[in-house]
Every structure is written in C-alpha cells, then in structure tokens.
C-alpha cells in the first residue's frame, strides 16, 4: 500500500496545514484532511493542485479531454458529520498502519499508535508508544486542575520558530519513511 498522510485538520493550525499541503503536493503523496467542516484553505489548495497536475499532464503529451479531467490532486478534504470524536473515529478507521498522522489530540494519537501509525503533533514532536501514557496522564491532571479552577499553562500561539520546528520534523519523518522533500 502507498504511503499516506492523514491530518486531524480541526486541531492543526492553518499555517501548518499549508506546510503539509505543499509537502504532499511536491511529493505527490496521498494526503487526507479530516474535519467536521470544510476548510477553505485546503479546498482552494486542492483546486489549485488539480489544475497544476492537469497542466503537467498536458505538458507530457496528454491531449484527450476526458483523460485530462480524470487527473486530480492526491490531496483530499473529508468532511465528517459533527459530533464528538467523529473526525477521530474516521481517521482511526481509515488510516492504514504505517501512515503518518498529524494531530494535537492526545487520545487520538494513542489510538493511532496502537494501530501502527506514525504520529506527530502540531508542534513538531513525535508521539511514541513510550511516552503516550505520560501524555495521557498529563492531560487528565490538567483537566482535573481546570475543573478546580486552577488553570494549567497553555501553549502559546504558533510563531515562526514553531512553524520551522514543525516543518523540520515533517521533513525528517518523510525522509525516514522513505520520502524526501
């Protein structure tokens, strides 16, 4: 089975989605963004990428209009019905083992690791079988503190260094998994 990227698009900031879109397009990887609503930036990128793919097909001598119309981007936007964990459930059911999955959602990451997927978060860090229990525990502690009115420190907004860390880790992951940017 071909290598795929799966993105929990509800939890990944727009700037990082752009990095993922460009990498998937450049490497001609199948990449599926899953959310409970359509994301205009992803939809527009898919349209632009489809146009570029068709242009390349024409440049390589394809002339039949039906064949050209059949050429499409390998990037997809899947909109699931709204509901708790509906996007998560879809990703777990659909992503094959060995896929690269990108999410900020720790319980989803645990489910994907159990399935045999490679998982990274939106800050450029890998989720591993060795640290997922600790991350789940930290999440529960923070939730309990919030319920008591004690607010745990939140992550700041994504800055240029954060985007670079994410892009660098994506590059490393794709290289390790047999793809290069």
Summary of predicted features, one role per range:
Residues 2-181:
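Nuclease catalytic cores that cleave nucleic-acid phosphodiester bonds
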């Amino acid at each position: 089975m071909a290598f795929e990227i799966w993105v929990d698009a509800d939890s990944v900031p727009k700037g990082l989605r752009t990095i993922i879109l460009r990498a998937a397009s450049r490497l001609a990887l199948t990449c599926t963004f899953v959310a409970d609503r359509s994301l205009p930036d992803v939809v527009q990128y898919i349209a632009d990428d489809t146009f570029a793919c068709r242009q390349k097909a024409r440049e390589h001598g394809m002339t039949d209009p039906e064949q050209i119309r059949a050429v499409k981007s390998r990037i997809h936007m899947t909109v699931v019905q709204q509901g708790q964990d509906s996007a998560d459930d879809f990703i777990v059911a659909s992503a094959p083992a060995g896929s690269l999955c990108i999410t900020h959602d720790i319980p989803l990451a645990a489910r994907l690791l159990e399935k045999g997927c490679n998982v990274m978060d939106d800050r450029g860090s890998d989720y591993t079988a060795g640290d997922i229990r600790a991350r789940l525990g930290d999440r529960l502690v923070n939730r309990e503190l919030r319920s008591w009115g004690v607010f745990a420190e939140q992550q700041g907004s994504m800055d240029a260094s954060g985007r670079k860390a994410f892009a660098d880790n994506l590059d490393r992951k794709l290289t390790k998994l047999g793809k290069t940017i």
